[in-house]
A protein has these predicted regions:
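Active-site acidic/histidine proton-transfer and metal-coordination neighborhood
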Residues: 39-47, 52, 56-152, 236, ...
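Short amphipathic alpha-helical segments, especially helix-boundary/capping motifs
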Residues: 9-14, 46-50, 85-87, 111-117, ...
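Glycine-rich, proline-tolerant flexible connector loops at the mouths of alpha/beta enzymes
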Residues: 14-41, 94
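Catalytic-core regions built around general acid/base machinery
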Residues: 30-42, 106-113, 168-169, 207-211
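Short, solvent-exposed loop/turn segments at secondary-structure boundaries
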Residues: 24-28, 59-64, 97-101, 163-165, ...
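Histidine-acidic metal/acid-base catalytic patches
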Residues: 1-11, 41, 69, 74, ...
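Soluble or luminal CAZymes and related metallo-dependent hydrolases
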Residues: 28, 32, 64, 68, ...
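Active-site beta-loop-alpha junctions enriched in small/polar residues
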Residues: 16-20, 52-55, 90-94, 124-128, ...
């Protein structure tokens, strides 16, 4: 898969290390880690992110989250010792006003893990989560004193159709963003569905990339395929990767932003 992604033309890659997935950080043995490390070192791709899913919704889940974040951090350093990728996750459901102080206190423990493992943890606002927009993530980060290893993931598909303007959300998120995820959101039969980046035409990726770049962001713009897409009958991951690449390469051209690669 790494070589295939490189052959399509991408500059970077993200690995899903969630429980039960192929690269599950709790299951990936030393032999496979060495193989992945070699493949990445020999590839033009940068490994920019490891995706987890560890919402700290109660004390038990917080304990699980802390353990899995430590496992993911270890994997990050095993795969790219000189520049370990960040770890990203959502924070789960609930009503924001009711759970935000609890989330803040639990994230304080995450920051200790990030500091101990020399790894960045990036929290992702999700439209169905308690933390659902950039302002929420910024509140948590600032409440904890802007720790350098606690950042956020920006994904406009979670803010679309919510009276949250693209430019405004970027302005709020930009100082704290370590990773940008790109996928489309569309309204179908009164519901919001996710699609491949550029497929629905609902998000101006050229404007998004341009504003982030002008604001000093130099991290990854990651093409994310939603489970709403990958779970469909007949889903073709290779075709999806090619479609996303073509759409986002064009967005970079429209933005007038030069892409950087592993070899730069």
């Amino acid at each position: 898969a790494i070589q295939t992604v490189a052959d399509i033309g991408y500059d970077a890659i993200e690995l899903a290390v969630r429980s039960g997935w192929d690269a599950d950080s709790a299951k990936l043995d030393a032999k496979r880690r060495r193989s992945l490390r070699t493949q990445l070192a020999d590839s033009p791709l940068r490994l920019t992110s490891l995706m987890e899913d560890v919402p700290p919704t109660d004390d038990r889940q917080q304990a699980v989250a802390l353990e899995r974040l430590k496992l993911a951090a270890g994997l990050a350093h095993d795969l790219v010792p000189d520049a370990p990728p960040l770890l990203q996750t959502v924070l789960g459901g609930g009503k924001w006003d009711e759970v935000r102080t609890q989330l803040r206190d639990r994230l304080a423990e995450w920051v200790k893990v990030a500091d101990e493992t020399d790894t960045i943890i990036a929290i992702k606002p999700h439209r169905s989560g308690a933390m659902s927009q950039p302002a929420d993530a910024v509140w948590l980060i600032e409440q904890l004193g802007n720790p350098p290893r606690l950042r956020m993931v920006y994904d406009y598909s979670h803010y679309a159709f919510r009276d949250l303007a693209l430019t405004d959300t970027i302005r709020t998120a930009l100082p704290h963003t370590a990773h940008v995820a790109l996928k489309d959101a569309a309204r179908q039969n009164g519901k919001i569905v996710f699609q491949l980046a550029g497929e629905a035409g609902t998000i101006d990726y050229g404007a998004l990339i341009r504003q982030f770049h002008r604001g000093g962001y130099r991290g990854d713009f990651n093409c994310e395929v939603s489970g709403m897409v990958s779970s469909q009958p007949g889903y073709d991951p290779l075709a999806a990767a090619k479609t996303c690449y073509a759409n986002l390469a064009e967005a970079f051209r429209q933005a007038g932003v030069e892409r950087s690669s592993h070899r730069d």
